[in-house]
Structure formats: C-alpha cells, structure tokens
C-alpha cells in the first residue's frame, strides 16, 4: 500500500478501538480516548 516500508510501519502498526475507532499505540492495553479494552490490530491489507 505505502511506497516506503517506514511509512507503512507508521500507518499500520497501530491498534484500533472497537468502541470509538480511535488509533492507539501498538502496545496499548486500553483506549486512550474512551478507556475501553476492546482493541484490535489495524488490518494490514485493505478490503476490496
């Protein structure tokens, strides 16, 4: 997707909160915005 591996790592190495859709650090255990612990890793491939 991204042109450079550094940019791809910066864009895709995050966790997404399933309650409020906030972007969180990859090592986060709870959401920085709403406090929920329902986090998922961001998808590495886009769905068509």
UniProtKB/Swiss-Prot annotation:
InterPro entries: Ribosomal_eL40_arc, Ribosomal_eL40_dom, Ribosomal_eL40_sf, Ribosomal_zn-bd. One of its GO terms (biological process) is translation. Transmembrane segments: none annotated. SMART domains: Ribosomal_L40e. It comes from the Archaea. One of its GO terms (molecular function) is structural constituent of ribosome. The keyword Cytoplasm does not apply. One of its GO terms (cellular component) is ribosome. Pfam families: Ribosomal_L40e. Keywords: Ribonucleoprotein, Ribosomal protein. NCBIfam families: PRK04136.1. Belongs to the eukaryotic ribosomal protein eL40 family. This is Large ribosomal subunit protein eL40. It comes from Methanoculleus marisnigri (strain ATCC 35101 / DSM 1498 / JR1).
């Amino acid at each position: 997707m991204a042109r450079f591996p550094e940019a791809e790592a910066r864009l895709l190495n995050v966790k997404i909160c399933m309650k409020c859709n906030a972007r969180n650090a990859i090592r986060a255990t709870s959401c920085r915005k709403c406090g929920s612990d329902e986090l998922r890793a961001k998808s590495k491939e886009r769905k068509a």
